[in-house]
Amino acid sequence: MLFRSYLSILPTNHAIDFMVGFIGPFVCGACVVHLRTLRPEYVRDAFVRYRITHMSLVPMVLKNLERGLRAKFDELPNRRRWMLDRLIDLNKLLTKRRANPGLSRMLLGQVHKAFGGHLNTLIVGGAFSDPKTLQFFYDLGFPVANGYGLTEACTAITVNNLRPFRADTVGKPLPGVEVRVLNPNDEGVGEIAVHGKNVMSHYLDDPELTAETIVDGWLLTGDLGHFDTDGHLQLSGRKKNMIVTEGGKNIYPEDIEMVFDGLPVKEFCVFAANYVWPDKRIGNETLFIALRLDPGQRFDDVLMNDLNARNRRLADYKRVGGYLIWEKDFPRTASLKIKRTELAQDIGLNADRAAIASL
């Protein structure tokens, strides 16, 4: 039996870590290494000392790892960077159809050495993942099993089985799990419903919420998505986050935020202005982006130009019309997802529409 060592870094009260970081490894007879800190030096030591082969994490942590690696790559002398890029290109060519961690370790040994030299698979879930980030790690020889699930469905509903790797989906339903798309629109997008033994029986002491969430044995997830021609599930956003324009177009903030991903700020979030201020309108603006700058950072022309350049990539009806500088850290869940409703309420109570600057 192959030796497996799982690194657990998420809070143990989070469903994905409990299932993927503990129950799953124990069933496989694997070793579990649980860290109570995300300090880089401790994480690096764990990779090397315990020969970590698998790791579960949420998209925000994966994104931070990507930023760290890109920063290290940018520090390389020109000749070494050129050589690294060619090796990455070769690895991409040789592993296009199927991952080969052993081959990738030979080609990109120094990169893999930074992760202990034994890492085979990253498992990510708990929020929407940026396909570009998933592809970045796959191209380095670290396959990312991107999945979708809810605590109400025992964590996992679909998982990408990596045969072949696809960065744009959350995979196919797991065995024994049925998934339907309810009331699809013209593009096939509708609410995702789940049925199977993995679905919870009820919410504790909340029969009304249970009745709203489980209908005829189907769990209504509140997430929107569609199946592609290969049977892979693709997510669009949260039903309650969806914005309907005056022209009848559906907009998902998560799609817009993908375009702004990599913006050099601490964090950001896209809202509909009339969601934050229900009785007010900000000129003709439908959307705005709330920005939390890094400590000591100033909003300058470089950042403004970056915002505008990204905004121009969007279709006209999806473009952000203004921005707001927010001085407090965004509230987050245990899986590090932004609490949109709580943040919107805070902005609505403590900021005036005059704080919105036009783009």
Residue ranges: model-predicted function:
Residues 196, 201-202, 224-314:
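AMP-binding/adenylate-forming catalytic core of the ANL superfamily
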Residues 4, 51-53, 120, 223, ...:
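Conserved acidic residues
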Residues 5-8, 193, 290:
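Short, well-ordered beta-strand segments
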Residues 7-8, 32-34, 121-124, 244-245:
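Short catalytic-loop micro-motif centered on adjacent basic/acidic residues
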Residues 1-5, 12-105:
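Conserved AMP-binding/adenylation subdomain of ANL enzymes
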Residues 55, 95-99, 103-233, 239-242, ...:
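Conserved AMP-binding/adenylate-forming
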Residues 271-272, 288-289, 308-359:
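Conserved C-terminal "lid"/linker of ANL adenylate-forming enzymes
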Residues 40, 167, 207, 211, ...:
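Amphipathic alpha-helical segments in well-structured domains
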